[in-house]
From Swiss-Prot:
Keywords: 4Fe-4S, Cell inner membrane, Cell membrane, Iron, Iron-sulfur, Membrane, Metal-binding, NAD, NADP, Plastoquinone, Quinone, Repeat, Translocase. The lineage of its organism: Bacteria, Bacillati, Cyanobacteriota, Cyanophyceae, Gloeobacterales. This is NAD(P)H-quinone oxidoreductase subunit I. Belongs to the complex I 23 kDa subunit family. [4Fe-4S] cluster 1 binds at C64, C67, C70, C114. It is a peripheral membrane protein. SUPFAM superfamilies: 4Fe-4S ferredoxins, ARM repeat. InterPro entries: 4Fe4S_Fe-S-bd, 4Fe4S_Fe_S_CS, ARM-type_fold, NADH_quinone_OxRdtase_chainI, NDHI. PROSITE patterns: 4FE4S_FER_1, 4FE4S_FER_2. Binds 2 [4Fe-4S] clusters per subunit. Its cofactor is [4Fe-4S] cluster.
Length: 209
């Protein structure tokens, strides 16, 4: 009789434990039933890149002074700068400029150290081609500005879940005119400036005492 009761008790515990785990799993299922799918229906839907997204590099030829700083700071010496020295003006004249995006690691060093800001990062990331030699962009191809995801009439922009406001689980519900994820440089400076000012005033007070 005792063994029978022990078996019944063990069976009941197993049933309760199984019911608990099933309930936990169904709780997750019911929680996700209230959400919309997070799969992006590319190419009809595209994620909105953040403000500091490192995409295809844009080149402005009139600003380039052929200083080759971009080549020196590049980890793989990637940009190819072809120029001639004009003896009359004593300046370098650019003939051609090219970057092979099949080799580029998109580190952004060339953009950061360019003295004339002729290089900039765009939000273009669709660089798929059938021939890898087509990824070698010359100054004409680099000078083309891509269409922004938010301005493309045939694409539905979606914001990534990591950048959605608290409590919002659907990137489709974001307002069309909402800003991108991340802070702009001037916003970072404005946020840090009050802290620097307060620390400076505290230091001045201590020196005065």
């Amino acid at each position: 009789m005792v063994k029978f009761l022990e078996k019944v008790g063990g069976y009941a515990r197993d049933v309760l434990e199984s019911a608990k785990y099933i309930g936990q799993g169904m709780g997750v299922v019911f929680d996700h039933m209230r959400r919309k799918p997070v799969t992006v229906q590319y190419p009809y839907e595209k994620l909105i890149p953040s403000e500091r997204f490192r995409g295809r590099i844009h080149f402005e030829r009139p600003k380039c002074i052929s200083c080759e700083v971009c080549v020196r700071v590049c980890p793989i010496n990637l940009p190819v700068v072809d120029y001639e020295f004009n003896k009359e003006t004593k300046k370098k004249e650019l003939n051609s400029y090219s970057i092979d995006f099949g080799v580029c690691i998109f580190c952004g060093n060339c953009v950061e150290y360019c003295p004339t800001s002729c290089l900039s990062m765009t939000e273009e990331y669709e660089l798929s081609v059938y021939d890898r030699h087509e990824l070698n962009y010359d100054d004409v191809a680099l000078g083309r500005l891509p269409t922004r995801v938010t301005d493309d009439p045939v694409v539905r922009p979606i914001r990534e879940l990591a950048y959605l406001p608290k409590g919002v689980m659907d990137g489709h519900l974001e307002d069309p005119g909402s800003r991108r994820a991340g802070e702009l440089p001037e916003e970072i400076v404005a946020r840090l400036r009050p802290a620097d000012h307060s620390s400076g005033t505290d230091a001045n007070k201590k020196e005065g005492e």
